[in-house]
C-alpha cells in the first residue's frame, strides 16, 4: 500500500484529514526507524492548522517539530492488516485433560459445539494417530461391562486441535444417584458415530450437555437395566408385604363399611342385643372387650377408616355366630357372670362400736402400714380393704376439718393467723429487723404504725349521706 507524495502546500490546504495514518509503524512501513517519530517538513508542525488557532510563539512553519519520541519496545511491526481477517481461538491455552478423573472417559473429550476456524484447511487440522484410553478393568471389573464401541473414540478417529479450550461435559458419575436418571433421559437420543473416512468434517457434540451414555463409567451403561430389574422385585416384595398387613384396608371401601354398619345395626336390633352386649360378646369370643361407645361410633361411621377396617372382621364373625346359633343369649352368660362380679360393691355400713374402735386406732396412728391394717381388720372382723379405705377417708376428712393430729397439727400451725392487735391511739412499736439504717448506727430504728379505726377508714371515699348513716 503506497501513498502519493504531497507537497506542503497541499497538506496545508486540507487540514480536515485528521484520520490519516500519522504513525508509519501502523501503516506497515518498516523502512522508518522506531527510535523516534519525526514528521516531514510542513506536515502537522503547526497545531493551528487542525484546531484553527493562532500560531504559538516559537513555532514557525520553517522549522520542523519532533513529537512524542518512542523507543523500539513499542514497535508494532508484527501487526499486519491481513491478521484481522482470520478468526483466532478465543482461548490461547491448550485444552486440559480430564481422563484421570473419570474412568472410561478418553482424552479426546468432544466439546458441545466446536467447528474448525474459517482460515484453517484440512491440512492444518492435525490428526493424531493414537488416542490414549483408560481401561475400566481396575475399578469396574472385566471389559465385558464396557458399553458398545460406538460410544468411545479409538485410534484413527477424528480429534480436535489442541489450541482450543473445551467445556467439560457434566458427568453424573460423581453423583451415583443421578446416573440412572440421566441415562433414562438420554435413551431416545442416539449418540453420533464419528467418521474416520472424512476427517475434515467438524466434530459432533457428544450429547445435550448432560453427558451421553458414552461418558458414563464402564459398568454403568450395562448395569442400568439390571439395576432396574433388581429394584423391581424389591419394590414388589415390599409392596406385597404391605398388602399382607393391610389387605383388608385395600379391599374394603367406604361404601362397604357403610353397608355393613347398616346391616349390623339392623340385625343387632332384630336379635335383641344392645351395643354393650355386642362389646361384651366380642370380649367373650376373641378376648378383647369393646365398650358400648366403640360399637356406637362404628355404627355411626365416626371411627377412622383404619379402625373400622380392623373392627369389621370381628363384628362380621360375631354376627355370623349370632345368626347361626339357636340361643344367642347363651353367648353372654359366662361374660355376664364375670361382669356382675366386677360391678361396684354395695356401700359398707359400720356399726357404732366398730366406728368408735376405728377412731381410737386412728388417734394412735393415722397412717397404718399393711401389717397394722391386717391386725386391725382381724381384731374388728372386717376386710382389709374396708379398713384401708376407712383410714383413707378419715385422713381426708381430717384435712378438711383441720383437726389437730400429728402431721396435720404441724401443718395447721402454718396456716393459723395471729389475731390482730387491739386498736388504740398510740403507735405500735415493731421489733427491729437487725439491719441498722444509716441514720441510726447504734441500733435498729423503730417502725411506728398509725392506728386506724375501722369506721374512719373509708369515710373519705363514701358519699356524705352514707357517712352520716355509718356514724349513726
Swiss-Prot record:
Broad class of where this protein is predominantly found: nucleus
Presence of keyword Repressor: no
Ranges in coiled-coil conformation: none
Entry-linked InterPro entries: HD, Homeobox_CS, Homeodomain-like_sf, Lambda_DNA-bd_dom_sf, POU, POU_dom, POU_domain_TF
Residue segments, region Disordered: 127-154, 187-255
Biased segments, Acidic residues type: 246-255
Bias (Low complexity): 235-245
Protein's name in the database: POU domain, class 5, transcription factor 1
Family: Belongs to the POU transcription factor family. Class-7 subfamily.
Species: Danio rerio
Biased composition (Polar residues): 220-234
Annotated region of DNA binding: 343-402
Function: Involved in early development of embryos, especially in the process of gastrulation. May play an important role in establishing and specifying rhombomeric segments. Seems to be required to maintain the cells in a highly undifferentiated state. In contrast to POU2, T-POU2 lacks DNA-binding activity because of its incomplete pou domain structure. Overexpression of POU2 does not have any effect on development, whereas overexpression of t-POU2 causes developmental retardation or arrest before gastrulation.
Domain named POU-specific: residues: 249-323
Keywords: Developmental protein, DNA-binding, Homeobox, Nucleus, Transcription, Transcription regulation
Gene Ontology terms: cellular component: nucleus
Location of this chain's protein in the cell: Nucleus
Pfam families assigned to the protein according to its UniProt record, in alphabetical order: Homeodomain, Pou
An example Gene Ontology biological process: regulation of gene expression
MF terms in GO: chromatin binding; DNA-binding transcription factor activity; DNA-binding transcription factor activity, RNA polymerase II-specific; protein heterodimerization activity; RNA polymerase II cis-regulatory region sequence-specific DNA binding; sequence-specific DNA binding
Amino acid at each position: 500500500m503506497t501513498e502519493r507524495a504531497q507537497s506542503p502546500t497541499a497538506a496545508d490546504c486540507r487540514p480536515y484529514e485528521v484520520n490519516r495514518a500519522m504513525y508509519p509503524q501502523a501503516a506497515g512501513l518498516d523502512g522508518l526507524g522506531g527510535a523516534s517519530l519525526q514528521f516531514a517538513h510542513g506536515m502537522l508542525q503547526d497545531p493551528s492548522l487542525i484546531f484553527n488557532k493562532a500560531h504559538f510563539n516559537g513555532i514557525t512553519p520553517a522549522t520542523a517539530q519532533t513529537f512524542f519520541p518512542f523507543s523500539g519496545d513499542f514497535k508494532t511491526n508484527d501487526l499486519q492488516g491481513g491478521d484481522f481477517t482470520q478468526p483466532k481461538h478465543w482461548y490461547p491455552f491448550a485444552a486440559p485433560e480430564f481422563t484421570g478423573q473419570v474412568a472410561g472417559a478418553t482424552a479426546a473429550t468432544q466439546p458441545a459445539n466446536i467447528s474448525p476456524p474459517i482460515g484453517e484447511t484440512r491440512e492444518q487440522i492435525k490428526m493424531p494417530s493414537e488416542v490414549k484410553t483408560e481401561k475400566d478393568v481396575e475399578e469396574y471389573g472385566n471389559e465385558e461391562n464396557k458399553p458398545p464401541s460406538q460410544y468411545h473414540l479409538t485410534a484413527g478417529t477424528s480429534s480436535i486441535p489442541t489450541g482450543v479450550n473445551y467445556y467439560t461435559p457434566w458427568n453424573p458419575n460423581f453423583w451415583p444417584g443421578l446416573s440412572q436418571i440421566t441415562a433414562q433421559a438420554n435413551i431416545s437420543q442416539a449418540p453420533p458415530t464419528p467418521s474416520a473416512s472424512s476427517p475434515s468434517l467438524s466434530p459432533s457434540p457428544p450429547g445435550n450437555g448432560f453427558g451421553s451414555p458414552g461418558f458414563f463409567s464402564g459398568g454403568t451403561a450395562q448395569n442400568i437395566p439390571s439395576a432396574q430389574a433388581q429394584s423391581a422385585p424389591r419394590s414388589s416384595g415390599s409392596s406385597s408385604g404391605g398388602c399382607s398387613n393391610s389387605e383388608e384396608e385395600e379391599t374394603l371401601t367406604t361404601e362397604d363399611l357403610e353397608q355393613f354398619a347398616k346391616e349390623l345395626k339392623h340385625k343387632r336390633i332384630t336379635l335383641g342385643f344392645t351395643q354393650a352386649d355386642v362389646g361384651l360378646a366380642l370380649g367373650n369370643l376373641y378376648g378383647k372387650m369393646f365398650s358400648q361407645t366403640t360399637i356406637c361410633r362404628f355404627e355411626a361411621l365416626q371411627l377412622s377408616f383404619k379402625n373400622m377396617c380392623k373392627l369389621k372382621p370381628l363384628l362380621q364373625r360375631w354376627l355370623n355366630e349370632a345368626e347361626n346359633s339357636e340361643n344367642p343369649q347363651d353367648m353372654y352368660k359366662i361374660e355376664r357372670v364375670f361382669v356382675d362380679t366386677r360391678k361396684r360393691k354395695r356401700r359398707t355400713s359400720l356399726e357404732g362400736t366398730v366406728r368408735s374402735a376405728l377412731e381410737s386406732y386412728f388417734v394412735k396412728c393415722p397412717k397404718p402400714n399393711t401389717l397394722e391394717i391386717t391386725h386391725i381388720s382381724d381384731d374388728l372382723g372386717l376386710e382389709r380393704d374396708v379398713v384401708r379405705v376407712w383410714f383413707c377417708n378419715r385422713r381426708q376428712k381430717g384435712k378438711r376439718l383441720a383437726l389437730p393430729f400429728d402431721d396435720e397439727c404441724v401443718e395447721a400451725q402454718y396456716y393459723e393467723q395471729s389475731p390482730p392487735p387491739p386498736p388504740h391511739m398510740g403507735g405500735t412499736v415493731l421489733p427491729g429487723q437487725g439491719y441498722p439504717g444509716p441514720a441510726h448506727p447504734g441500733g435498729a430504728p423503730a417502725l411506728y404504725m398509725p392506728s386506724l379505726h375501722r369506721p374512719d377508714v373509708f369515710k373519705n371515699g363514701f358519699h356524705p349521706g352514707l357517712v352520716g348513716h355509718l356514724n349513726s
